[in-house]
Amino acid sequence: MASATLLKSSFLPKKSEWGATRQAAAPKPVTVSMVVRAGAYDDELVKTAKTIASPGRGILAMDESNATCGKRLASIGLENTEANRQAYRTLLVTAPGLGQYISGAILFEETLYQSTVDGKKIVDILTEQKIVPGIKVDKGLVPLAGSNNESWCQGLDGLASREAAYYQQGARFAKWRTVVSIPNGPSELAVKEAAWGLARYAAISQDNGLVPIVEPEILLDGEHGIDRTFEVAQKVWAETFFYMAENNVMFEGILLKPSMVTPGAECKDRATPEQVSDYTLKLLHRRIPPAVPGIMFLSGGQSEVEATQNLNAMNQGPNPWHVSFSYARALQNTCLKTWGGQPENVKAAQDALLLRAKANSLAQLGKYTSDGEAAEAKEGMFVKNYVY
């Protein structure tokens, strides 16, 4: 990627927010090398981000690894075979009218290159539905040495060449998920590692034509209250945007996938949708620049109904960003159970998927009501130490 280098004398912050409480020396003028992105894809990135962040639509996250997909299939008594994964993914992407509610679909690498059971490329099916294909590009979590039993996300090695190939295959956005655990700290090291990795990924993605979805998931695990989640989330997003700026990421060409600000899953004090909305919107206003086109929330183990109610509460007034959803289990859970691996249940399962997609579409517009929701849709899906 071509870039231009300018020499400029200026005062620059030398520390991110984590170091803000330390005694700072008086700033001195320094001569620094400023790198200006010469982005060949900039206009396309902005257009793609705006397409995904369109009114009444959100993202279907169907990028579970083959191992995680195997767990989902096992829950309905199916073996984890490529044929079964193909059958389930075919069910999802061929749901009639899905594009009315879904603007983007995050795929696992196998899915990006996969065809439906009828032999048509899944990417082509999505495009016909006016759904932008995306791709999970991280390589999963591994232990972070020197931390309090925390993790970091791998996958930067070879990312540029992989993303160039994904672009040629039809992907137009990418997703990188890292996690922060409140019961384990989080340590300064873990937060910095998460933020830096996300920033490098975002810069590399934009250089290769893919809109990066930035996802530092704050896990639900723990007994902490909502105020503690809010405190940690402020630090995580401050670090993330600090390092994205350092890496010359164009904010108009990214999307965010944050956790909602909620109490820990094991906290005795539960939060109402209005409380979740108040805390989450306060976080966004404090930390997220209005240049960012879309905030696509993850559900993180909330029940299908809870995730929809919380999103609806956040859309009761105007926001400077498109506030929407990027759900996996909160869109698919009832659909998967309805299907049960039986061909005769495909239509009923697709209807269940469309029902949830429509509910969240209405929530994005602030028009959702929970009247008539099934009891099963209200069951929480939190799994302690969940591995995606």
From Swiss-Prot:
Enzyme class, broadest EC rank: lyase
Positions contributing to substrate binding: R72, S299, G300, G301, R329
Keyword Transit peptide: yes
Induction annotation: By exposure to light.
Swiss-Prot/TrEMBL keywords: Chloroplast, Glycolysis, Lyase, Plastid, Schiff base, Transit peptide
Enzyme Commission number(s) of this protein: 4.1.2.13
Pathway(s) annotated for this protein in UniProt: Carbohydrate degradation; glycolysis; D-glyceraldehyde 3-phosphate and glycerone phosphate from D-glucose: step 4/4
GO biological process, one term: glycolytic process
InterPro entries for the chain: Aldolase_I_AS, Aldolase_TIM, FBA_I
One Gene Ontology term, aspect cellular component: plastoglobule
Active-site residues from the entry: E215, K257
GO MF annotations in UniProt: fructose-bisphosphate aldolase activity
Superkingdom of origin: Eukaryota
Residues carrying the site annotation Necessary for preference for fructose 1,6-bisphosphate over fructose 1-phosphate: Y388
Quaternary assembly: Homotetramer.
Protein name: Fructose-bisphosphate aldolase, chloroplastic
Species name: Oryza sativa subsp. japonica (Rice)
